[in-house]
Swiss-Prot record:
Disulfide bond positions: 55-114
Main subcellular localisation: secreted
Keywords: Amyloid, Calcium, Disulfide bond, Glycoprotein, Lectin, Metal-binding, Secreted, Signal
Signal peptide segment: 1-19
Chain ranges of the Pentraxin (PTX) domain: 24-224
Designated gene of the protein: APCS
Entry protein name: Serum amyloid P-component
Organism the protein comes from: Bos taurus (Bovine)
Binding site for Ca(2+) 1: 77-78, 155-157
Assembly and interaction partners: Homopentamer. Pentraxin (or pentaxin) have a discoid arrangement of 5 non-covalently bound subunits.
Length: 224
């Protein structure tokens, strides 16, 4: 009887761990540097990506480099990675190849980041606080692998692991959305302004499935 009750409890608890949650007006708070604390984002991505756009808001007072978004597949790390190298310097990795852009930033201050990549041309773009940076190019003709492990707060050196405290994120992340297309400049501006008129196809902050591991707290956004 006790075993039966235990299994019933597991069946009740597990769906809640991966519940689809509306996080509008909220953030994930990563209160410390660590090699363990992270959030796994859950999505059913069955096909490789030939186009993508990722947008998020972040607030951190770290001056060292850290991972903002880590997407790995079983066969390789850094399949898709957004990494902040230092104040005003951002890198996008596609298939372990990277491009880097630089922006003028106040430090510390909240930032809205969008990045996109188009396989047919290889063109990668960054938009910081609604303003476009100089375009870069990488991995023309490539396809980003499917069935990913997506992690916030840490940079993966293996599938879902291999974390390094010196690359961990400390601060707050919110309003994260991802599409399987390259958004137009007009659409990027709408996202920056907080519009929800452009429906995300991969990750949606207003209907997010996630799992928290370690010391990460969901709190109201007070700086957006």
């Amino acid at each position: 009887m006790n075993k039966l009750m235990s299994w019933v409890s597991v069946l009740i608890i597990l769906p809640e761990a991966f519940a689809q949650t509306d996080l509008r007006g909220k953030v994930f708070v990563f209160p410390r540097e660590s090699s363990t604390d992270h959030v796994t984002l859950i999505t059913k991505l069955e096909k490789p990506l030939k186009n993508l756009t990722l947008c998020l808001r972040a607030y951190s007072d770290l001056s060292r480099g850290y991972s903002l978004f880590s997407y790995n597949i079983h066969s390789k790390d850094n399949e898709l990675l957004v990494f902040k190298n230092g104040i005003g310097e951002y890198s996008l990795y596609i298939g372990k190849t990277k491009v880097t852009v630089r922006a003028t930033e106040k430090f510390p201050s909240p930032v809205h980041i969008c990045t996109s990549w188009e396989s047919s041309t290889g063109i990668a773009e960054f938009w910081i606080n609604g303003k476009p940076l100089v375009k870069r190019g990488l991995k023309q003709g490539y396809a980003v692998g499917a069935h990913p492990k997506i992690v916030l707060g840490q940079e993966q050196d293996s599938y879902g692991g291999g974390f390094d405290k010196n690359q961990s994120f400390m601060g707050e992340i919110g309003d994260l959305y991802m599409w399987d297309s390259v958004l137009s400049p007009e659409e990027i501006l709408l996202v920056y302004q907080g519009s929800s008129s452009i429906s995300p196809t991969i990750l949606d902050w207003q209907a997010l499935k996630y799992e928290i591991k370690g010391y990460v707290i969901v709190k109201p956004m007070v700086w957006g």
